[in-house]
Amino acid sequence: MLPYKKVDPAVLAHPVERRGFVDAPFDYARPEGPRIRIFYRLIPAHGSTPGDSAHPVVVVINGGPGYPSSAYRPLDYDYANPDSPKNGPIDRLKHLLKSYRVLLVDQRGTDGGSAPLDMEDPSIDANEIARSFSSDSQARDHLAVIEEVVPGGEPFFMIAQSYGGMVGMQYLSLTLAGARRPKGIVFSASALPYEDALASSVGRRAEQLKLNLRLREAIPDVEGRLAKVRERLKSLGLNPDQVHGLYSFLGKGVTGVWEKGFAAHLEKLLEMPKEELEKSNRDNFGTVSLLNYILSSANFTPGETDRTIAKRTSELVPYEPWMIDENWVISQAGGGVPWRENFVAAMDKRPPPATPFASVPELRAAIALNSVLFTPADNDAYVPAETYVEAIAKFEVPGSTRIQRLPGGHSAIFLEEGHRAFLAWAGSLA
């Protein structure tokens, strides 16, 4: 029996969004078995309502793995004050909502409203979680929500970003069996199945090395600034190496802008009280989620874990001592908690089973039935553009796929130029 957190039913009440639950099988191979509830949010276009069909629906499949839809729009988003700091540094949906409604689904097991797992319970089972909270089940959950929320015959689009690409590919494979097809689906800076795990991880680390060097070019005294942040952390009784959690800020935006944002964030860190620093570290992926660790292994690095891969990439792509290093964060996956340390060590020795995917020929057949846009992104610290283009090649289908490179890093599709590209592509579809 897996441990779950309780979901507050008050999460349904909202003055702007339409929120709800859809019942779904816990195990789609046993539809008559136990069921869980999948939480969704339908966000209206600006100045509209959730039911306004004049604005088509875009289903945004968020990244992770292991993060709920609130990572893309907070549950307590301040609609009256869109520029409020509480809404986060990037409003991923503000451009989409000019013309579309957006449908978000909490992926099962994440810390949201869809059967959230209690990942702080020592009884968690990595193998069971990998099987039952897979990208395949998440794709089927999205289909169940679409069938409930989007009326039959009404066109909709999908954007699968980051880990969402795995869920998106699983969804496309369902269309071979008659699942509702989107009018078009975007795979933006996304993970894709059948990648070489070591090669893609080396590419990711090499891209972050380039971004560190670019940071030093833009901010010549960045080493000194980072040293001050380390001193600040140490003075508060925190591990100065937590500065490596800043890897998520590398390449976060277009060239010439993200570097200034990084420098400004360093200044903020020097003023933050201890509690706020710890929260910033958690919120910006400076700590490892165990759900992410499990699902990342099952989807991205079958037969390995993030930590076993990180040990190899650190040797293959060495860093200078001052540099921001994601691999340090990964090395701390156990968090210093004895049962977590044992859990992660056991996973490293015996990773969970790989998530099954349709074959490449089957996925190409599914792509041939759909309209697909792939968008590599410059400055992407997670899915480097060159690595992504290589991964895309096996899925290119003439007449069905297009590739458009975007500026702006990992969230490029949600920025202004990415949105213009989306509008132009969507408008070109029959």
Where is each model-derived feature located?
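Gly/Pro-rich cap/lid or specificity-loop segments adjacent to the active site
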Residues: 4-36, 41-236, 325-365, 370, ...
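Alpha/beta-hydrolase fold active-site neighborhood
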Residues: 231-355
